[in-house]
Amino acid sequence: MALKLLAVLLALVLARGVPTLMHLRSFAWLRSWLRALGGTPAGAALVLLLPAVLVGAAGYALAGRWLGVLWLAFALATLLWTLGPRELEADLEELLNAGEGEARAAALGNFATDNDTMPQWSAGSVVGAGINAALRRRYAVLFWFFALGPGGALLYRLARLAANEAPAIGLAAASHALLRRVAGALEWPAALLMVLAMALVSNFDAVLGSLRAWHNEPGRGWLGLDPAFLPAIAVAGVNADVEAGDGYAVDTTDVAGELEDLAHLLNRVLLVWLVLAALLVLGGWMA
């Protein structure tokens, strides 16, 4: 776990400090694999599992060699490859600073692939789009990296990319449905952990109350393995923070204010995750 935490810290610093690394995050081969093998659900599953198993096996083979340096380098390369593909903070800042017209539309378009619909210039839509982008670009990757190592990070990234690409390449409906279910199921535990972190660093009652209200609506349940609850919970948490921020009510329809608070909230959530990982490392050493 200590090496995993170190790899995550290095990856986050490099991804933020060296923007050119973003251009190395290429999965152009995935479309060819999906066209060749994704015609059936079994083939689509193979497209996800085969590369992930190979990467996981490579990581296992490198573990313990040269005091873990080889594994660390391999894990770092895998994280830099699977995070993103765009940097979250840069896109949030661009959206915050964008004027009206084409610049704003382009900034909103950066979040289109992270959401089922094109986000609109409204507080709720922007916060929902931003939290989905955070989940899919960063937190789900980190969750499965901590859980399963480099193979887990790649498995999630391939599942999400394949689910996004399936309509464009004309995959069968059954294959597309499988890919969407797998991607959603992999995102669900990461989304739930994000909500718990938000409850700790934001308005506890607003966050958990919104979580209960969303799941208590007809047709929804706690075991649906569906991360669709995340935008509603993020909006509730951000609204509560904005209203309490200066000791008086603030307009929660102010897109810029909500976007700024979302950026701060995501930083605090990341800090909670890293602190939790550090505590697990310390617990392992003490044991």
What are these language model-derived features?
Residues 1-287:
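Hydrophobic N-terminal alpha-helices or hydrophobic patches in metabolic proteins across all domains
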